[in-house]
């Protein structure tokens, strides 16, 4: 294809691979409290408290802290009937003293009775297919007979059907949450420790829900290694397409760790799938306070262009042409403007590449000469000011345009 030909091609005619706009996979809408999950809604951010649910006061406070900083859905662990009943009091206190925060109950080992109780108090129940009907693995086993497989499937249906029916009756949601590290022994024998085994674990439960005409379902396929997680979600989307299902996906890299590496792992896994159009809600899992997960989640969503909830800063890496201490100035600009939302602000070290590279920014701060800063609105240079007045002059420019709000 020649350069002349490419000039006449509309971006809509190009493959999705070359589009600069993410085209989300079309999924059905599932309501979790007042938050919608699905392609008709923004990608939702969620997290999980690490308090013992029996500590009602601490759990209520932890949920509120997360919600106040932007966590839209909060999960809590429910390992027993006592915990399930405690959730009812937690929800009551939230509604009475704060807001009705969308809550998800995490139910694992042989959790039918727990799920039936906690479904009264939460907006969504999460079950793990690998642990739902659980028995300790037999190290001497070499295979599963057809009769054993049939018996296990029947037990799953008998235990799962009451949960589906109660969620359906209450118009609540279900997450079928597969973890790579906890596949059922039967699945490991049949498919190995593979993404395909994860997909089949989920699809078994999806088909049961479909047979009961229950469709308030969200699906997750989490693994601690991004390549496994990526393969599992892609396979899951393909499997659903093949069988005519369009349930939303909850993305996450489980056990991502802490610090920079934990954030990088989560970003690689979650961000990659989002750019492919997969994912309707996300959770960044860090071995840190849950509150630290929320800014990372919103940063991922903003980076890929799906939600804009903060200032987008554009700044060059600095070089020998830089006319001021770029790192120091970026920090000052951020301190002065980080409370704003929806703006793009560029800080560039010199005029060689600065104006061109910041062309899409709302405002620009560019080194013009020794001790001189040029301020831009879009592509237009507005004024030159001494360097020591640059940040305050930028703030005044934003104010004059009516785009400033006080912190």
UniProtKB/Swiss-Prot annotation:
Keyword Iron: yes
One matching Pfam family: GcpE
SUPFAM superfamilies to which the protein is assigned, alphabetical: Nitrite and sulphite reductase 4Fe-4S domain-like
Swiss-Prot/TrEMBL cofactor(s): [4Fe-4S] cluster
Annotated GO MF terms: 4 iron, 4 sulfur cluster binding; 4-hydroxy-3-methylbut-2-en-1-yl diphosphate synthase activity (ferredoxin); iron ion binding
Chain coiled-coil ranges: none
GO biological process: isopentenyl diphosphate biosynthetic process, methylerythritol 4-phosphate pathway; terpenoid biosynthetic process
Entry keyword Mitochondrion: no
Annotated catalysed reactions: (2E)-4-hydroxy-3-methylbut-2-enyl diphosphate + 2 oxidized [2Fe-2S]-[ferredoxin] + H2O = 2-C-methyl-D-erythritol 2,4-cyclic diphosphate + 2 reduced [2Fe-2S]-[ferredoxin] + H(+)
Transmembrane segments: none
Binding site for [4Fe-4S] cluster: 316, 319, 350, 357
Textual note on the cofactor: Binds 1 [4Fe-4S] cluster.
Enzyme class: oxidoreductase
Pathway: Isoprenoid biosynthesis; isopentenyl diphosphate biosynthesis via DXP pathway; isopentenyl diphosphate from 1-deoxy-D-xylulose 5-phosphate: step 5/6
Keywords: 4Fe-4S, Iron, Iron-sulfur, Isoprene biosynthesis, Metal-binding, Oxidoreductase
Entry similarity comment: Belongs to the IspG family.
Record NCBIfam families: ispG_gcpE, PRK00366.1
Protein purpose: Converts 2C-methyl-D-erythritol 2,4-cyclodiphosphate (ME-2,4cPP) into 1-hydroxy-2-methyl-2-(E)-butenyl 4-diphosphate.
Protein name, entry field: 4-hydroxy-3-methylbut-2-en-1-yl diphosphate synthase (ferredoxin)
